[in-house]
Amino acid sequence: MSKAVVVFSGGQDSTTCLIQALQHFDEVHGITFDYGQRHREEIEIAKTLASKLKLASHKVMDVTLLNELAISALTRDSIPVSNDLMDNGLPNTFVPGRNILFLTLAGIYAYQLGADVVITGVCETDFSGYPDCRNDFVKAMQAALEQGMDKKLTIQTPLMWLDKAETWALADKYQSLDLIRDETLTCYNGIKGDGCGTCPACLLRKRGLEEYLADKEAIQARLTAKC
């Protein structure tokens, strides 16, 4: 029996990965992390979607320790979300170590479940400047987890080389565009669906959807060439 663990935030990218995984694995398990994030509403969204999509299991893990260590606009309400980069060239929404921790815990969970695949929705094409969304990082994490647990483990990244328009096309391929558009939460300010319309996550999501809807056939062809 094939099993996969999906790092699942309840946002556009992870929900798209989850829906795809349900078509390819016998058992799909979701793992969601509560790190005291600014947009904590995403946790309830993830619970609702996990139930609706009938996952084999859905675990919500308390990792608020990360909030104590990682200072970011996503972990401190007192820091406004900015569209400008910080002096170090990173967005102020970057949470240091977040994906290191998430993939480590997802790998441990997969080990316990007897799953040999972890799926995450990170993307280097539209990666928002986050270093822990790059392909080299994911490969390094996979190697470390395999070495550390002495077990074959693959970290799949279905969106790694897709832009946001192609990610919308992927959702549409699985007849889930409306669900992704209306029922997921990507907004850094915690607003479901179209979101606030002004934070970096909402702007990226909106541009991608507009591009996809403007020329579905061409974007679907691009997606087919990549997948």
UniProtKB/Swiss-Prot annotation:
UniProt keyword terms in alphabetical order: ATP-binding, Ligase, Metal-binding, Nucleotide-binding, Queuosine biosynthesis, Zinc
Any one GO MF annotation of this record: ATP binding
UniProt binding sites for Zn(2+): C187, C196, C199, C202
Catalytic activity reported: 7-carboxy-7-deazaguanine + NH4(+) + ATP = 7-cyano-7-deazaguanine + ADP + phosphate + H2O + H(+)
GO BP: queuosine biosynthetic process
InterPro entries per the UniProt record, alphabetical: QueC, Rossmann-like_a/b/a_fold
Binding annotation for ATP: F8, S9, G10, G11, Q12, D13, S14, T15, T16, C17, L18
Protein name according to UniProt: 7-cyano-7-deazaguanine synthase
Essential cofactor(s): Zn(2+)
Pathway field: Purine metabolism; 7-cyano-7-deazaguanine biosynthesis
UniProt similarity note: Belongs to the QueC family.
Transmembrane region(s): none
Enzyme Commission numbers on file: 6.3.4.20
Pfam families assigned to the protein according to its UniProt record, in alphabetical order: QueC
Keyword Transferase set for record: no
Manner of cofactor binding, per the entry note: Binds 1 zinc ion per subunit.
Biological role: Catalyzes the ATP-dependent conversion of 7-carboxy-7-deazaguanine (CDG) to 7-cyano-7-deazaguanine (preQ(0)).
Keyword check for Nucleotide-binding: yes
